[in-house]
Amino acid sequence: MKKIVFTGGGTVGHVTLNLLLMPKFIEDGWEVHYIGDKRGIEHQEILKSGLDVTFHSIATGKLRRYFSWQNMLDVFKVGWGIVQSLFIMLRLRPQTLFSKGGFVSVPPVIAARVSGVPVFIHESDLSMGLANKIAYKFATKMYSTFEQASSLSKVEHVGAVTKVSDQKNPEPDELVDIQSHFNHKLPTVLFVGGSAGARVFNQLVTDHKKELTERYNIINLTGDSSLNELSQNLFRVDYVTDLYQPLMELADIVVTRGGANTIFELLAIAKLHVIVPLGREASRGDQIENAAYFVKKGYAEDLQESDLTLDSLEEKLSHLLSHKEDYQAKMKASTELKSLADFYQLLKKDLS
């Protein structure tokens, strides 16, 4: 039986594509393994998926671009993670390793290359993260969501592979209940803060609940169960799975962070959106770059977190609603999306 090892983690964005691809390989008779951190979100997501995947936990350390005494400790963690991954590779002898990035992916990628296993990696953002910059040196091939510099000879631009489904499923009962609390004469605004929510969105909704619910139906994915609430024109919930796409479709506008996975999902369904990227003080600036790209393409509006107020947000919402057809036409004309089926066939071809 053919074997494939997946890796990637730290955030849902570094796991999502793996979760989409693994069932395809399982259906085609592959034995699927995953290398990650048992304390990480990758382990949680695989357990929730119920997929027949063998999980191997390794030591992992954070790769920092700045000086920290923790770098010394993490060097040893990464080194031990490489040794652990090497033993896993030598024991399994897989046909390939597929990496979606994140700090936990570096040891398996290095170990795979050392043990002669082909390495395929995927980069979602406009600029490569530190983990994938390291991984690229050991990769057989990298697939990218955005166009990359021509000097990167191992990169193939494939566009975004999203988890948005074309299949229309019956409305969940919970969605019907939510809609019964909404005023259908008002536009619906969905706040999406990533897998852990976004405190800035949560605070905005909390501070301006009255004003917001007078003018909009508000859906707030918070990442915090203490904020859960269903009331007139307001639905706040910490986490959703089956409700995710129905809520996306229900919304007239989405206010989101600038993670590539989420914004390309919105592009795939031509959904109006305002991007509030994580600032450089909290990230390497990849979300700012992603947001600027989407604004330049005419897909979205952006708003820096430092400028986010009720008034500034309402100005963006009003602009999007009044120019809805223009934004949607540009999104529908995009050629930057790839279906899961097409990407899977491309990957299988490259593996052969």
Curated annotation (Swiss-Prot):
- Recite the UniProt keywords alphabetically: Cell cycle, Cell division, Cell membrane, Cell shape, Cell wall biogenesis/degradation, Glycosyltransferase, Membrane, Peptidoglycan synthesis, Transferase
Q: Which GO terms describe its molecular function?
A: undecaprenyldiphospho-muramoylpentapeptide beta-N-acetylglucosaminyltransferase activity
Where, subcellularly, is it found? Cell membrane
The catalysed reaction is:
Mur2Ac(oyl-L-Ala-gamma-D-Glu-L-Lys-D-Ala-D-Ala)-di-trans,octa-cis-undecaprenyl diphosphate + UDP-N-acetyl-alpha-D-glucosamine = beta-D-GlcNAc-(1->4)-Mur2Ac(oyl-L-Ala-gamma-D-Glu-L-Lys-D-Ala-D-Ala)-di-trans,octa-cis-undecaprenyl diphosphate + UDP + H(+)
| Chief place where the protein resides | membrane
User: Has keyword Endoplasmic reticulum?
Assistant: no
* Biological process according to GO: carbohydrate metabolic process; cell division; cell wall organization; lipid glycosylation; peptidoglycan biosynthetic process; regulation of cell shape
Which PANTHER family is this protein grouped with?
UDP-N-ACETYLGLUCOSAMINE--N-ACETYLMURAMYL-(PENTAPEPTIDE) PYROPHOSPHORYL-UNDECAPRENOL N-ACETYLGLUCOSAMINE TRANSFERASE, UDP-N-ACETYLGLUCOSAMINE--N-ACETYLMURAMYL-(PENTAPEPTIDE) PYROPHOSPHORYL-UNDECAPRENOL N-ACETYLGLUCOSAMINE TRANSFERASE 1
Q: Which family does it belong to?
A: Belongs to the glycosyltransferase 28 family. MurG subfamily.
What this chain does, per the entry, is described as: Cell wall formation. Catalyzes the transfer of a GlcNAc subunit on undecaprenyl-pyrophosphoryl-MurNAc-pentapeptide (lipid intermediate I) to form undecaprenyl-pyrophosphoryl-MurNAc-(pentapeptide)GlcNAc (lipid intermediate II).
Q: What is this protein called?
A: UDP-N-acetylglucosamine--N-acetylmuramyl-(pentapeptide) pyrophosphoryl-undecaprenol N-acetylglucosamine transferase
- Give the organism, scientific name: Streptococcus pneumoniae (strain 70585)
Gene this chain is encoded by: murG
